[in-house]
Amino acid sequence: MSEYTHYIQKEGEEKVNLETNFGRILYSKCEGLDTKGKRKNVYTETYSDSDNLRVWQGEDVTREATKITLTLAFIGDRAERAATFDALYNYIKNGKFYYWDNARHKKAYLILADEYKPSEEAFYGSQPYITASIPLQNLWGECKKCNDNGNLI
């Protein structure tokens, strides 16, 4: 397990530790947490009699959803790896959920965006494992700052 704690939480439910609540999962990486989605509420016009672009911007910035890829390793014997892989899938397959950790203090609001499939079995020394790169969409369009408990700040 990593020295940091990684959490996920479905709306209206208690937070769960990603690495321990489903079985034996090891966090590998999470890509896309720093991505900011394209701004949606901007309108521009060009006119032939002007060198300047006319711009309208909404008061509050709204963004398009961004992609996040969460990569995890599932360890244990073959049956345990399969059960852990399925338990996590059953948790995230339907509905929206939050992800955050106590390393970056960034929180994302996510849905499962694409197929969820494991890698071929691999070995680290004598330890068998499978990995999965899980494609997610951040519905906020950017991550928000949070504390260790996941409360937005």
Regions found by a protein language model. Give the residues of each.
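Extracellular/virion structural assembly segments
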Residues: M1-I153
